[in-house]
Structure formats: C-alpha cells, structure tokens
C-alpha cells in the first residue's frame, strides 16, 4: 500500500510527465536524424543489415502494434502479435489495459469490464471476430475471462466510428481477432503450460495449492489441388485455480437519516425527505447492514476454438469458426453480519458530505455461510463467405450465433445471536438478541468493536433464527445476426471504393430468480445443527493487510453441513413454479443499413484519404413482465416474507427507436513519418438488455416492528424500463501521430463528445394486492431525458526503444499512455438523487450529489518499461485509474464509487531455442485492494483484497 500511495501524486501529474516524455523522445529522434545524415555522407561505410534481423517477443508485439495503428482508417490503438500466444498479457482484459485510454474494473483480482476513454462498458461495444458476443451478466460488455489469451493474436480499439461498424460504440469498439490460418501461412503445433499461485491461498486452512493452465493449438494449411487451399486452426485450454478474497462490505441500500434526532435503542433512524434537507435539516448516510466476508474459491475453465478457412479458387473464400467456453466457479463463504446498522445510531461523527465516520449502535449479529456455484457456458461462431467476381466488385455475407447460459446457485445459512446460547445459558454482553458496538472509520477499513463481554468466537452464542435459503439465478443471452456487404472499386476518380450493406440481428435475454426458504426456531434442531457443523475459522490473518481492521475471525460453520442439517437435504431444488415478478424476458430486434465511400486525393499537395458514410438503425424492443398477488408469511423471528401466489398476468411493453449515424474520417500524410487524423461522427449506446426488463423487485425494511405491510415494504424497484431510449452522442476527434522508426511512436489526440439523453429516477405509485389487501407503493425506475452534456478528453501515447544506447542498454524500451477525460454528465442516485414527477415533468432536488457517467475515470495511465535483447524479455507494467462510478449489473441500485488504484505487474521470459521458452510473471505486486463508497465518495461501502499472483510458464512450438 505504501508504494501505491507514494505513486499517486506522480500520477496526478501524469499529463505533464507525458508531455515531458514526448519532448525527450522528440529530441532523441532529432539527434538520431542528425546521426543518420552524417552516416549518409560516409559512402565507404558498409550498409547495415539490422532491419533483416528477426524480431521476437515484446519488441515484435510493439512493432506489430505500431504498424497496425498506422494502417487503420480510423483513430485506433492496436495490440497485435504476429504469432499466436504472443500477446504480452495473462488475459485479454489485462492486455486491453495496456492500450491507450483503456481501463478495466477489477473482479476476482483480474480485469473484467472495459472502459474506453474513461467511459463505462455500456458506452462502448465489444466484438469477437467482428461479431457481437453474448454474456451472462445482462449487460452489453464481453466477459473477457471466457476467451483464452493464448488463442488470440490481435486486440484493436477503434475510437472513431465508421458506417460499416456495428453500432454501439460511443466510447469505441473493442474487437478481438483470432488468427486466420491461411494468412498465418505455416504449420504450427504449440503446447503452453502455466503453473499459477495466489499468495492468499497460503492463508487458507484447506488450501488449493498450485493451479495450472494448459493450452494446445494447431494451425496448418493444405493444398487441395483442384479444390483450392484449406487452412485449419484448433485450440483447447483447461484452467484450474483459486481466487481467495477477503472482504468487508455494507448493504447496497442506504438511508439519509435525520442528524438532529437521538435514535432510540429499539428502532431505526428516521429518514429525512429532500424537502427537509433543502430547509436545512442535517443528515448522515447509513447502510442497512455491515458484513465481514471470507471467501475460498475454486475456478475451472474448459475452452475449445476451431476455425476453417477455405479458398476453392481466387476470388472466393469461405470461413467458419466456432468457440466453446465453459467456466465453473465454486465459492465457500463465511460471513459475520451486523444486520441492523440503522438501529440505535448515536454518538455520531459525520463528514461534510454526510459520510458516517463513527457511531455507536446495537445490532443482531449473524454467523452466515454461502456455498455458491456458478456455471457459465459460452457458445459462438459464424460462417462468412466472401466473393470477388472481378477486380471491381466484392460481395460478402456473414451469419453468426452467440449464446451464453449462466446458472448461479447459492445455498445460504444463518444462525443469529440470542439472549441465551444453545444450552439455554444467558449470553454475556447481549441485550435481547442484540449486541452493542462502536464503529470507527480511521484506516483502510472501518473498525467495529463489540461489547467485550460478547464472544464472537464462541459458536454457542449463535443459537437463534436459523434460516436456510436456496437462491437460483439463471440467465440466458442469445444473439443471432446476419449481414450482407458489397463494395465497388471505381477505376478512377476521388472515390476508391463505394460500400453498402445491411445487418439484421435478434438478441434475447431471459432471467429467472428463484428462492426457496426454510426458517427454523426449534432450539433442539438449532443446537444439533450448531454442534454438528462447527469448523475452525477457514483462514489465518484475515484482513491483515488492511489498517483499521478489528475483527480477524469469528465462529464459523461448514456451509453444506449446516444447510443439510436444517433442510434435511443437500439441495432442496427450486420451486415447482419458478416464475416471479422480478424475472426478465426481453427481445431486441435490430435492422441496420449503411452506405460508405472511401476516398483518396491530395490536399495542398499532401496525400489525403478517408471515408464518409451514414448508418441507419432501427431497434424494436419487446419486454414481458409478470404481475401477481402476494401473500405475507410471518417468519418465526418476527420478520416477514412476501410470497407470490402463483397467479400471474403477463404485461408486454413494446418500444422502438430509429437513428441516423453519419461518420467522416480523414487521414492527412503530413510527412512520410507523420499523420494527422480527423474523425466526425454520431454514435449511439443502447441500454443494457437487463435495463429493458419489465419486472419488479420488493425491498423489505430491516427489523421486526411494523404496524402495516406497507411500512415493512421499503420500496418496489423496477428492474428496468423497456421504453428507455439509446444515448446519442455527437463526436469529434483529432489525432497527430509520428512514426519515426519501427520501434517508436508518439501520438496525441483530443476529442469531444456531446451526449443527448440520460436517465433520471422517477417514482410512480402502483397498486399491488398483498395478503388480500390493496397496497399503493411507490415504484422507482429510470426514465430517459433529453438533457445534453459534454465530455472532453486528451490522449497521449509514447513508445520508444533506446537502441542507440551502448550495449547492453540498447535493449531498453518504454511505452507510456495517458488519458484525461472530463464530463458534466449526471447520474442521479436511485433513492437519494433528483427525481422527476411523471405527471408534471418537474424535477425535484435530491439529497446527495449525482455521479458522473458510468465508468468515467478522469485519469488513466499505463506505463511499461521493457528490456528485450537476444533471448531475454523483461517487462514492468504499472496501471493506474482514478475514481469512477461503477453501476451494479442486474438491477437498478444506488450510486457506487470505486476509488483510485494502481497495480504493478512484472513479466520475464527466456527463449531457450526456437522451439522452447520459459516465463515467470507476477501480478498486483503492490497488493492493491479495491475500495468502493456509497452513495457519495468517502462513505465507505466495501474493501476487497485479492493478494498477489504468480505464474510460471513453459511453451514449446514445433
């Protein structure tokens, strides 16, 4: 942590550093140019053959990436490798992080969702081999963990749009490309094995030990004589490993409490209204619960890739590819839950923005377990046919399919504190079922100190309100698409090509959320389960790297044992009728047409080329939601459940939109080494598919003392809004790029985006029949506005190899990238932000300040220092991202902010010979945690730590 904290002031000056680097590189190149002129004046000197030396490793990847960027017809950045498995990263997500302007959200310690130019994943698009790919999250991002990096050789980010690109990329489009076997041009069999180790595994009592990842790939070409040429690519991968986590977290529902009141010991704080806050009533922000969570995990992935490329004769090509990836993640969680943190809140210390920094309180304490199994399978592929009947015409068609199925089953158990233990003895330090505690936030994590008379480590003390839940979430996302493209090449004139095409796609998203619950209060049953399922705390040194932590362990129980002891079975299975009001059933049909012209000419004697086009897109949405009556079930602990009766009526909501997306890109060759690019375009970003859901979720207030069912229901939240319109953006980009030699690049880009559209929460009263009684409850959902907002940004990239230094320093090189973005976009908090009156259209002021646009980091920096000479490749990679707003995927929620973070990775490889190489890699050497706040910055929500990871690899090619 200290290393990262020291680096952050440097990062805040990253723009100045990048400019200084640019000047230094330019000066160095000027010196090189002078040396080159002097060399030309000495004809007796023998010509060098340096350019004929075969370049490999990281230097080869950088050269290939520079060449690819230079050849693009739009503003773009590319990470490319001539050979398979040569992308310099452990995963596709980590590879993308090194591309200028790209940043990732970290899950399980690795890169997941991609933000481009500081904009979240829903403002960008991601394609695999040029096609949309499904995922199991309900959003439009791509699960990069599903794709083995060893089988991908190019990742490109197109930052301006072209009419023939699939729509959706306001921020940009990420395209992952597998190798094309005929273009590869040689036979290759490759075996790649890596041993993996997470240092957090050493803390576990039941450690997984060393994991592994094995990949085998085969590429070949065949001459079929009269039937043309055939290329084949096959790849298989198996992965097994572990990703332990240590977490302190809070609930995702926050209340603005009246700071003038003294909260009684037997009740929750009183929420303030926006009108009270506007009138000067002070408030503080508090969650419904706090939880400590220890996670042991096992991860397994099997992947298979196949591609055929057939050229029966010149002018005709048929390509078929298929991908299959199945991943199973098994988690065993032990949790200590303070479930009533709105109760008896006093002696408060409050920050300027309402963040709660310290207080006393009383809460029920729960020892909980969760045995979670997630299975996710991706299947995708496509058939592409390209025909050139003559030199002037090219016709192509592409048929694709992508489907992801995710099943997530949680078996959750809870044992609560009580006035007496399992033997009937009075428990010291407890009042009723609640324990007094103090909360102090002064370190990395808050410290919670309970009454010292109450022993958190004594399992006897968790003797009440046993609850077993089986939650099952199933998601299915399918994309079917077809496109046809044609291109005509004129013999002469300004236009070098005229293109046009059509694309049809159908995306479906369905989810099912099922819960089976068993509540037990019988003391004998609870005592027997408690005694039978006790276990030692699963790890040592829990949250030892987090300053301020006060709880290192607590009484825990075997998750599967406890579930079986309470329910009588290992798995209850789901309900006979799993339908529910929260389920989603969304269908989205898209039709797109485009026409585009490519041109080449001169401007003031300088070469000019580019493209001009327009894309028309129509989107039709059909979303089905269920409405039905609910029964109230009283739990033995005094709380309630809302159980659907099974009598449902389907409501179908339909919506559509049409947009025109013009685009213009131009490239001016200022010199042989310098290019000036321009991009003007309009782009769209569709809402996530899950955000188009027509379902409803019920949020129950914590506690037991309510006079009516209406009081117990905190709110009903719409799972989405099918009428949500796409976010539109008018964009302008200018990029100046200098390519002094094969190892060097210096570029600067400025860009501007004006957004039209956004979302503001609205509250609509809806009538529900609950326990036979009509209850009117406010339903919160986002509605689309026509508000305008702006974003401006700057990108800097510098890549250089110091080949002019004396040996052995001539192998040193550096790659630096920096992105700055700023926007006045506003994302209102779902519960505490501005809200719009649906009847009048008037906006009422909220309590907390809005967040910016999803995923916006003002500063994103990536720095690589590498040493590549002979058979040795060494890399140090530092990645930094400033604070950003991160939405929850799957259902609307309040605003969450992820704090700034920086991670350091090291990689080393050695080529023993042309066939054999070995590598050693380490990630997150700074042991950087992920810390998030809600619903305002500085209001602690969660601390996740994953630890460092190490990889030892061997590769053999023949």
Can you describe what each PLM-predicted range is?
Residues 206-343, 359, 366, 373-390, ...:
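Transmembrane beta-barrel wall of Gram-negative outer-membrane proteins
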Residues 131-159, 209:
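Short acidic/polar hinge/loop motifs at secondary-structure boundaries
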Residues 750-888:
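Gram-negative outer-membrane beta-barrel transporters
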Residues 363, 367-378, 582-589, 655, ...:
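Outer-membrane beta-barrel signature, preferentially recognizing the C-terminal barrel domain
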Residues 93-132, 159:
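Extracytoplasmic beta-strand/coil segments of soluble accessory domains associated
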Residues 52-87, 113, 121-124, 131:
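N-terminal periplasmic "start-of-domain" segments of outer-membrane beta-barrel proteins
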Residues 246-292, 332-369, 413-468, 520-536, ...:
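Solvent-exposed loop segments that connect transmembrane elements
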Residues 812, 879-889, 909-958:
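C-terminal beta-signal and adjacent terminal beta-strands/loops
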């Amino acid at each position: 942590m200290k290393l990262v904290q020291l680096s952050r002031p440097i990062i805040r000056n990253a723009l100045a550093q990048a400019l200084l680097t640019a000047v230094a590189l330019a000066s160095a190149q000027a010196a090189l140019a002078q040396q080159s002129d002097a060399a030309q004046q000495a004809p007796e000197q023998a010509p060098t053959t340096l350019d004929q030396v075969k370049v490999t490793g990281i230097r080869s990847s950088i050269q290939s990436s520079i060449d690819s960027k230079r050849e693009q017809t739009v503003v773009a950045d590319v990470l490319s490798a001539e050979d398979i498995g040569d992308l310099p990263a452990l995963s596709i997500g980590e590879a993308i992080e090194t591309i200028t302007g790209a940043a990732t959200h970290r899950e399980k310690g690795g890169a997941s969702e991609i933000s481009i130019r500081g904009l979240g994943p829903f403002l960008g698009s991601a394609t695999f081999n040029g096609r949309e790919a499904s995922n199991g999250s309900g959003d439009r991002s791509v699960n990069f963990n599903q794709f083995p990096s060893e089988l991908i050789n190019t990742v490109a980010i197109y930052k301006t749009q072209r009419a023939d690109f699939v729509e959706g990329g306001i921020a940009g489009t990420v395209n992952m490309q597998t190798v094309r076997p005929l273009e590869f041009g040689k036979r290759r069999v490759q075996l790649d094995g890596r041993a993996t180790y997470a240092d957090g595994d050493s803390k576990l009592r039941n450690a997984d030990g060393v994991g592994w990842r094995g990949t085998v790939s085969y590429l070949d070409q065949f001459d079929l004589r009269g039937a043309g040429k055939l290329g084949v690519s096959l790849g298989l991968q198996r992965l097994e490993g572990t990703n332990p986590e240590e977490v302190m977290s809070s609930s995702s529902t926050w209340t603005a409490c009246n700071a003038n009141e003294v909260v009684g010991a037997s009740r929750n704080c009183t929420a303030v209204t926006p009108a009270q806050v506007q009138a000067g009533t002070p408030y503080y922000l508090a969650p419904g619960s706090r939880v400590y969570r220890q996670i042991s995990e096992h991860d397994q992935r099997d992947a298979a890739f196949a591609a055929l490329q057939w050229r029966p004769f010149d002018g005709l090509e048929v390509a078929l590819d298929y991908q299959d990836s199945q991943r199973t993640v098994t988690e065993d969680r032990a949790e200590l839950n303070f479930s009533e943190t709105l109760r008896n809140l006093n002696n408060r210390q409050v920050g300027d923005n309402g963040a709660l920094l310290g207080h006393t309180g009383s809460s029920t304490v729960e020892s909980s377990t969760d045995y979670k199994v997630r299975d996710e399978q991706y299947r995708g592929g496509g058939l592409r046919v390209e025909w050139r009947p003559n030199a002037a015409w090219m016709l192509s068609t592409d048929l694709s399919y992508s489907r992801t199925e995710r099943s997530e089953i949680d078996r959750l158990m809870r044992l609560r504190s009580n006035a007496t233990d399992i033997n009937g003895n009075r428990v010291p330090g407890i009042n009723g079922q609640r324990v007094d505690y103090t909360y102090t936030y002064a370190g990395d994590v808050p410290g919670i100190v309970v009454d010292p008379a109450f022993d958190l480590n004594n399992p006897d003390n968790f003797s009440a309100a046993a609850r077993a839940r089986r939650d099952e979430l199933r998601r299915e996302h399918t994309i079917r698409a077809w496109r046809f493209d044609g291109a005509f090449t004129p013999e002469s004139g300004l236009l070098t090509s005229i293109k046009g095409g059509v694309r049809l796609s159908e995306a479906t998203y369905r989810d099912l959320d099922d819960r089976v619950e068993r509540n037990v209060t019988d003391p004998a049953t609870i005592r027997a389960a408690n005694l039978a399922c006790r276990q030692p705390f699963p790890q040592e040194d829990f949250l030892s790297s987090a300053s301020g932590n006060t709880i290192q362990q607590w009484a825990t129980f075997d998750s599967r044992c406890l579930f079986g002891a309470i329910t009588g079975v290992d798995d209850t299975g789901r309900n006979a009728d799993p339908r529910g009001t929260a389920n989603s059933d969304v269908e989205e049909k898209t039709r797109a047409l485009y026409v585009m012209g490519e041109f080449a000419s001169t401007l003031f004697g300088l070469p000019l080329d580019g493209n001009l086009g327009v894309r028309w897109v129509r989107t039709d949405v059909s979303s089905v939601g269920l409405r039905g009556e609910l029964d109230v079930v009283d739990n033995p602990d005094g709380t309630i459940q809302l159980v659907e009766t099974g009598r449902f009526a389907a409501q179908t909501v339909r919506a559509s939109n049409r947009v025109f997306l013009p685009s213009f890109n131009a490239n001016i060759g200022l010199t042989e080494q310098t290019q000036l690019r321009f991009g003007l375009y309009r782009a769209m970003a569709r809402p996530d598919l899950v955000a188009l859901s027509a379902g409803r979720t019920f949020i129950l207030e914590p506690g037991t003392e309510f006079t009516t069912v209406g009081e117990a229901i905190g709110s009903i939240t719409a799972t989405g809004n099918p009428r949500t319109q796409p976010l539109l953006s008018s964009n302008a980009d200018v990029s100046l790029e200098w390519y002094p030699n094969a190892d060097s690049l210096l570029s600067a880009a400025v860009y501007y985006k004006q957004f039209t559209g956004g979302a503001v929460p609205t509250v609509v009263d809806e009538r529900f029949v609950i326990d036979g009684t009509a209850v009117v409850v406010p339903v919160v959902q986002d509605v689309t506005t026509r508000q305008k907002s702006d974003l401006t940004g700057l990108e800097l990239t510098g890549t250089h190899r110091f080949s002019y230094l004396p040996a052995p320093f001539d192998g040193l090189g550096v790659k630096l990238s920096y992105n700055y973005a700023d926007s006045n976009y506003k994302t209102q908090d779902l519960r505490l932000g501005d809200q719009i009156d649906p009847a009048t259209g008037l906006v009422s002021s909220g309590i907390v300040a809005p967040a910016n646009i999803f995923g916006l980091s003002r500063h994103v920096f990536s720095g690589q220092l590498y040493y590549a000479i002979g058979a040795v490749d060494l890399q140090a990679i530092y990645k930094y991202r400033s604070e950003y707003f991160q939405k929850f995927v799957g259902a609307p929620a309040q605003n969450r902010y992820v704090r700034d973070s920086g991670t350091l990775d090291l990689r080393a490889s050695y080529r023993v010979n042309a066939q054999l190489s070995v590598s050693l890699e380490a990630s997150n050497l700074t042991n950087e945690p992920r810390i998030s706040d809600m619903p305002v910055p500085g209001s602690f929500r969660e601390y996740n730590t994953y630890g460092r990871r190490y990889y030892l690899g061997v590769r053999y090619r023949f």
